[in-house]
């Protein structure tokens, strides 16, 4: 159970937050990296995600604490990702905007952060900023080579992101409406308008 800003975050990808805790000696190895899961050998069993069985993790007490850790962790993750991927990463304006919007869509809508109101939406936005910061730090490590904005490509990207957001908003409304209103939002979801 992750306690963030004094609340248990049950959404936005923070619950259930499976962490291997009990394993036989010699069946686990840990590699260097931020938030890396261990490499396990042998049979793995997950416990049912019951709040009464979960460890309580007092994660972030304040926004300042989140930002401080964000700065430290994103520096490490930018190096890790650059080492793992080809050096010709995409740092175009379109890609940077997609990075933020897609992480937000994933956390707020697909992983239901919006269901926890300000807490869930705030963490969804902070996680989107986290992913953007990793990309910007990778760009920094590559020497800040600036790409010009391709107006057609950028416009196309924004239109695609608008459709995705329209889909997720309509999907959310479908879950909270009944009758004719639900039908209306189902049609909008299908059309992504």
Label each residue range with its predicted role:
Residues 139, 145-193:
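Long, positively charged, glycine-interspersed low-complexity recognition regions
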Residues 1-145:
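Catalytic-site signature of metal-activated, phosphate-bearing donor transferases
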